[in-house]
């Protein structure tokens, strides 16, 4: 499955990295330093057990027009930048792309719905935690369940996302 990420900070890195175990992962990040680090050395994650893992997505770019449509797009960008990031990433979101928000805060769904049809939107919560240690480097600080659902779409979208997450090692 082709999975895109909107933002590759602390949490985006945890999810993007782990999902490379089972999927093609593509990253859009507005920060060139993040893209350069991920493309050069991969995503480095310091795990809670003390181990360090490195994952290699297909590409990290500041130009999403080079990527194409995704099966799933996972949003981790800060709310303040959400609208402009979604506008830039329209080429990654096709008529069958499921857009999942795992962002903190409220109001994300409404912002996403300005750009994406509501039937394509999933929202979720996660008990995972992370700290950003630098471009492409995160410390995984907490592990737990990730819950996904839809507001207007059918449960099939949420099931597809949950399957993709499980394949990457998330519960």
Regions found by a protein language model. Give the residues of each.
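Conserved beta-strand segments of alpha/beta enzyme cores
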Residues: 24, 44, 59, 120-122, ...
């Amino acid at each position: 499955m082709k999975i895109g990420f909107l933002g590759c900070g602390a949490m985006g890195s945890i999810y993007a990295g782990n999902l490379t175990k089972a999927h093609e992962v593509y990253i859009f990040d507005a920060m060139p330093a993040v893209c350069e680090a991920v493309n050069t050395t991969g995503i480095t994650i310091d795990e809670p057990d003390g181990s360090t893992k490195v994952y290699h997505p297909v590409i990290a770019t500041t130009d999403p027009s080079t990527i194409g449509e995704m099966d799933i797009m996972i949003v981790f960008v800060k709310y303040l930048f959400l609208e402009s990031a979604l506008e830039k990433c329209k080429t990654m979101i096709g008529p069958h792309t499921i857009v999942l928000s795992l962002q903190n805060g409220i109001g994300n769904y409404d912002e996403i719905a300005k750009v994406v049809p509501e039937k394509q939107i999933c929202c979720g919560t996660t008990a995972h935690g992370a700290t950003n240690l630098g471009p492409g480097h995160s410390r995984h600080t907490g592990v737990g369940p990730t819950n996904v659902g839809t507001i207007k779409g059918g449960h099939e979208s949420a099931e597809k996302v949950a399957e993709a997450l499980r394949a990457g090692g998330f519960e």
